[in-house]
């Protein structure tokens, strides 16, 4: 079960970056970006901040953590 909804692909494309380019900017492998885009990998806070800066969008818009039953999952 996914713990968050990833909007990374949309923001990456809006920033006109390929997966490879974004990976190079934030210092990870392309495979990490693939897993983040499909919400199969939880980013560290540092990585989330680096991605946010690279694509020019707030962390909370890139990685959406929906509330369940009035509490965070």
Q: Residue ranges of each PLM-predicted region?
A:
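A short, Lys/Arg-rich alpha-helix, primarily the initiator
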Residues: 1-14
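Residue-level signal for the short linker/turn that defines the boundary of a DNA-recognition helix
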Residues: 6, 16-17, 43-46
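Alpha-helical residues within the helix-turn-helix
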Residues: 13, 24, 53
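Short alpha-helical DNA-recognition segment
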Residues: 17-34
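DNA major-groove recognition helix of helix-turn-helix/homeodomain DNA-binding modules
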Residues: 46-61
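Short, charged recognition helix plus adjacent turn
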Residues: 53, 63-73
């Amino acid at each position: 079960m996914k713990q968050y909804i990833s909007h990374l692909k949309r923001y990456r494309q809006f920033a006109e970056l390929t997966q490879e380019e974004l990976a190079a900017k934030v210092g990870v492998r392309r495979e990490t970006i693939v897993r983040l885009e499909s919400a199969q990998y939880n980013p560290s806070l540092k990585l989330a901040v680096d991605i946010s800066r690279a694509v020019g969008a707030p962390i909370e818009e890139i990685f959406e953590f929906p509330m369940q039953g009035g509490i965070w999952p």
